[in-house]
Amino acid sequence: VHVFPVGIGRIGRDTPEMITKISQKRPNPTWTPPNSIREEYREKGIELPQVVPAGPENPLGDYALRLAYGAGDYLIHGTNKDFGIGLRVSSGCIRMEPKDIEWLFEQVQRGEQVTIINEPIKVSLEPDRSVFVEAHEPLTRSDGSKKLLQIPVELKWWLQDADIPSAKAKAVIFAQNGVPVEITPPMIEF
């Protein structure tokens, strides 16, 4: 599993949860703004071109992975600006740092499965038996209020069975900063 900071769809243009596949890999993509986005910009007094060619003005950056979900309208792509990663600012696509999308683009194949989830707490048991916990604010689709997260009962049971103090997991969950943190105590070698 690889973890990357991403930008996702803003409220009203949410990035949907999905299980899909990569339908297309496009280096140096062009961007054809959909009519809905063109209209949004027009209302702000900005006229978007019919097609934005590859290059420094293209908001998709240098790489795009088209997802097969729905009509294929969703992409995982780079960006041409140092803005939006870690935020809800896109029109539904998943925006990545240029170096991260370049790496991902080289690693994945057309037809590979992609799963988009919305889980505020994630737990990973690694092959070396280390455990990582990541927590972020739950995404809201309406009022923007924060929700106090609790340690899931399954994680509590696992922490007890593995004899791992829950204080570190609680701190990660309370912080809600989206950073995976190892919660297993260091191994003591004699």
Which sequence ranges carry the predicted segments?
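Secreted/periplasmic proteins
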Residues: F4-P5, T32-P33, Y41-E43
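Short, solvent-exposed aromatic-acidic interface loops
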Residues: G7-R10, N28, N80-D82
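Glycine-rich catalytic cores of cysteine/serine-nucleophile enzymes that process amide/ester linkages
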Residues: V1-Q24
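Short, solvent-exposed loop/turn elements at domain surfaces
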Residues: V1-H2, T15, T30-P33, R141-G144
